[in-house]
């Protein structure tokens, strides 16, 4: 039975009973767009030309996710206030200040006719359904529009592109904390002096750590460009000190439900600071993380290659990704993709498969531009005063007066911060600027690739810092750390802002330097947003460190344990890693510190309890508590340990950046991976002593023996936990971490009504979606088998009467139990599993 939002418009209704086989598609009229949905509501689009293929794509997206996409459009362009009111004015200003619309429009205008038809077809398809919705709102208007009091508007190619720019480029390739780092360095130098202060800064924010596990093994290759911290700080010494509140404190604060709080600037800073101290979501609130393992022909069993992807975007209702099959005009693909991009980020075409994780390469720099005191809007560049580019922006406000402001831009990029005390404007330079649309289309065009050379041609065009992964029907596997990266001047410390002029980039580094590997000796590729290659420099984010403590080791350890893996075993790695505590990192030090204590000493009891635990967090039958209190013990100990070490060494207020244990969250469930916190990584290096390659400029243990500090923190943990759970450690039942699929998108903007949030009792540290592609399986006669799980479900449609589409959350239980559903590719398979069918006649 068809859902009401899937009624046929502009075309022919073809019932399941009388429809013809999809194998007859070749004989269909050239104007025809055929839409077939499988048993989970996932659509497959069939058309003979690119425009109509993507017309069908946009059409089904509007059917399934119209309100989610509308709010994504407004979130990425800064027009939320127009429909939700003055609480979002500050948010809209921040968004508009961070992009340049004319650049995106110029990129679209320069596209070939074929590429333009991708974006135009998609927009026209959405508009076709929107017209029907507006004509019959009593039947087709998603209830969320009525709840929030506005109607959907037409889309254009710019809107389609901006969804990608705002949710991929600006979310995963635009993170920088160079100004925050400068604020930290200023405070550290004030406490320790210039030379020692810089050494302490290097201890807190190293650039390269030789002990960091890498996706490309050291025996395969290492990064050829070397960084010597002693010779890369010339420019940093020329930048004025920074005494204002760190910019990260001005990021919009969110409540427990992930919604923007819209509070005063002072209250916002207080809230953000408290959230950092208590466990900000992700790496200090930055998006994190994603994992991947690809098993090649020398390690796969009963198959030639196995790819398992787990991108961790956060958990949302409707789902963050959208499942789609595209067939025709040179495309024959199936998979899913964030925000229904017109290019699948996760999928396969029967011959190759692909997937992604965030790369966290450093593709953004901040330039400290000296402002003119006499000529407003002018800045100094190469000794001359240059007028900034500017544009006036007016924000329409529901039930309020419009607000107008100016966005400024230098030769380096948009001005994101101004320090009036030092007459300095901080401009953001992006290596991918001007390449946003080309990057989107690289994902689209890779869907046609049939081998490694063709696929890497598209990887070279993808300018964002994203890890790309490859497998093919012959069992070959590969990896590329894609992105465009600056060729910086000698003396440029990429962690800190640099002055203008002579510190301008020399250009972009050659793609030949991007880390990549094809058929590695290990037989597999694994990544959890760790370093791609030995000696590769990390992001400038103060909260992002590649070091000896890394979660990717959990994947590597499992894959190294046995010579070969079946598809089911590869899938089970999701379960094993998602429930695993990082006990292994600190247990040796804890055991050493308590070895000579009496067995009845509470501190010894805590460590003995940890030592008897395998590190896997399993939930009791009550669905609310863990079978073992291990994570609670480590959380309490690490929280105290960090306060006694890293936090104590860092001047206020910056100590709060390092106080979170990594176990807690400030929202009703995590927004990404509960990873090793930045403070824990710094502490881990200190506990390694001489084995750590990171110089310890300041003794984090304050001159005391480290075991004494460990025992004191254990005593704190005992005092905290025994008051809460009693004196019998064996009887402790600690609360399990829950998981929420939020009704607010990652910006904190509603993408659904609050009642649409879904909940899962047990948090699993795994992908927002998980997919697996298996090439040349020995069972059956198919050259490829594929599965995914996209929770809560394919649809986001809530009917005007409040009834949710049956595919809104029909993958929720599947996700919770580590299940998966098949992804169909061939016409025969799609035909056998179809639930509904539509045929449109599309004139152009």
UniProtKB/Swiss-Prot annotation:
Subcellular location(s) per record: Periplasm
Signal sequence region: 1-26
Family statement drawn from the similarity comment of this UniProt entry: Belongs to the peptidase S45 family.
UniProt-recorded name of the protein: Penicillin G acylase
Species this chain originates from: Kluyvera cryocrescens
Enzyme Commission designation: 3.5.1.11
Lineage: superkingdom: Bacteria
InterPro entries according to UniProt: Ntn_hydrolases_N, Pen/GL7ACA/AHL_acylase, Penicillin_amidase_A-knob, Penicillin_amidase_dom1, Penicillin_amidase_N_B-knob, PGA_C, S45
Catalytic activity: a penicillin + H2O = 6-aminopenicillanate + a carboxylate
GO biological process: antibiotic biosynthetic process; response to antibiotic
Positions of the propeptide segment: 236-289
Keyword Signal found: yes
Textual note on the cofactor: Binds 1 Ca(2+) ion per subunit.
Binding site for Ca(2+): 178, 362, 364-365, 494, 540
Cofactor: Ca(2+)
UniProt keyword terms in alphabetical order: Antibiotic resistance, Calcium, Hydrolase, Metal-binding, Periplasm, Signal, Zymogen
Pfam families: Penicil_amidase
Gene: pac
Predominant cellular place of this UniProt entry's protein: periplasm
GO-annotated cellular components: periplasmic space
GO MF entry, a single one: metal ion binding
Keyword Translocase: no
């Amino acid at each position: 039975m068809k859902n009401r939002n899937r009624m046929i418009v502009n075309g022919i209704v073809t019932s399941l009973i009388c429809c013809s086989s999809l194998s007859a598609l070749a004989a269909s009229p050239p104007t025809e767009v055929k839409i077939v949905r499988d048993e989970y509501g996932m659509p497959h689009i069939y058309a003979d030309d690119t425009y109509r293929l993507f017309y069908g794509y946009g059409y089904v997206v509007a059917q399934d996710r119209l309100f989610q996409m509308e709010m994504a459009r407004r979130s990425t362009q800064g027009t939320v206030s127009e429909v939700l009111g003055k609480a979002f004015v500050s948010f809209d200003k921040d968004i508009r200040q961070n992009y340049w619309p004319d650049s995106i429009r110029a990129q679209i205008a320069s596209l070939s006719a074929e590429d333009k038809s991708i974006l135009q077809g998609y927009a026209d398809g959405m508009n076709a359904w929107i017209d029907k919705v507006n004509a019959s709102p009593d039947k087709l208007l998603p209830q969320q529009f009525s709840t929030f009091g506005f109607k959907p508007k037409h889309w254009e190619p710019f809107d389609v592109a901006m969804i990608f720019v705002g949710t991929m480029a600006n979310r995963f390739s635009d993170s920088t904390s160079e100004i925050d780092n400068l604020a930290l360095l200023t405070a550290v130098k004030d406490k320790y002096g210039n030379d020692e202060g810089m050494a302490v800064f290097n201890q807190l924010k190293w650039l390269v750590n030789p002990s960091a596990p890498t996706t490309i093994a050291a025996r395969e290759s290492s990064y050829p460009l070397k960084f010597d911290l002693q010779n890369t700080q010339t420019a940093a010494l020329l930048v004025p000190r920074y005494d204002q509140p760190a910019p990260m404190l001005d990021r919009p604060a969110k409540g427990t439900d992930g919604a923007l709080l819209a509070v005063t600037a002072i209250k916002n800073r207080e809230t953000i600071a408290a959230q950092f101290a208590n466990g900000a979501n992700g790496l200090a609130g930055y998006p994190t993380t994603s994992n991947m393992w690809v098993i090649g022909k020398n390690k796969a069993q009963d198959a030639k290659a196995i790819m398992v992807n787990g991108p961790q975007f956060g958990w949302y209702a409707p789902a963050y990704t959208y499942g789609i099959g595209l067939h025709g005009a040179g495309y024959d693909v199936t998979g899913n993709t964030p925000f229904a991009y017109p290019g699948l980020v996760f999928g396969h075409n029967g011959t190759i498969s692909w997937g992604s994780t965030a790369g966290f390469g450093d593709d953004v720099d901040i330039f400290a531009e000296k402002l003119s005191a006499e000529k407003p809007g002018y800045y100094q560049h190469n000794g001359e005063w240059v007028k900034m580019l500017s544009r006036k922006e007016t924000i329409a406000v529901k039930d309020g007066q419009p607000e107008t402001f100016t966005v400024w831009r230098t030769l380096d990029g948009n001005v994101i911060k101004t320090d009036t005390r030092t007459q300095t404007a901080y401009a953001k330079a992006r290596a991918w600027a001007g390449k946003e649309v080309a990057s989107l289309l690289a994902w689209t065009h890779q869907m046609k690739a049939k081998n490694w050379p063709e696929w890497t041609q598209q990887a070279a065009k993808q300018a964002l810092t994203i890890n790309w992964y490859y497998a093919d029907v012959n069992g070959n596997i590969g990896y590329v750390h894609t992105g465009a990266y600056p060729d910086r001047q000698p003396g440029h410390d990429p962690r800190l802002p640099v002055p203008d002029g002579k510190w301008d980039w020399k250009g972009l580094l050659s793609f030949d330097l991007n880390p990549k590997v094809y058929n590695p000796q290990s037989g597999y590729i694994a990544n959890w947003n760790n370093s791609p290659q030995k000696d590769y420099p990390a992001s400038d984010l103060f909260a992002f460190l590649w070091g000896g403590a890394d979660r990717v080791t959990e994947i590597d350890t499992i894959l190294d344990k046995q010579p070969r893996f079946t598809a089911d075993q590869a899938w089970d790695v999701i379960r094993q890693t998602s429930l695993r505590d990082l006990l292994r990192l600190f247990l040796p030090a804890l055991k050493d510190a308590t070895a000579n204590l009496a067995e009845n000493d509470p501190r010894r009891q805590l460590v003995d309890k940890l030592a008897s635990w395998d590190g896997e967090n399993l939930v009791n039958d009550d669905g609310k508590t863990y079978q073992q209190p291990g994570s609670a013990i480590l959380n309490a100990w690490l929280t105290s340990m960090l306060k006694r070490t890293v936090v104590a060494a860092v001047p206020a207020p910056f100590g709060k950046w390092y106080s979170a244990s990594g176990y807690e969250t400030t929202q009703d469930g995590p927004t990404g991976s509960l990873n090793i916190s930045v403070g824990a990584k710094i502490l881990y290096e200190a506990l390694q002593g001489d084995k750590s390659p990171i110089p310890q400029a300041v003794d984090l243990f304050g001159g005391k023996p480290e075991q004494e500090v460990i025992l004191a923190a254990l005593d704190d943990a005992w005092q905290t936990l025994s008051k809460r759970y009693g004196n019998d450690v064996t009887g402790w039942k600690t609360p399990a971490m829950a998981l929420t699929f939020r009704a607010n998108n990652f910006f904190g903007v509603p993408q659904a009504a609050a009642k649409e949030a879904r909940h899962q009792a047990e948090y699993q540290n795994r992908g927002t979606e998980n997919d697996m592609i298996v090439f040349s399986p020995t069972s059956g006669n198919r050259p490829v088998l594929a599965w995914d799980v996209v929770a809560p479900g394919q649809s986001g449609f809530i009917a005007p009467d409040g009834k949710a589409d049956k595919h809104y959350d029909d993958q929720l239980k599947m996700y919770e139990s580590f299940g998966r559903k098949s992804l169909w590719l061939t016409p025969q398979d799609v035909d056998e599993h179809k639930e509904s069918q539509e045929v449109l006649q599309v004139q152009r």
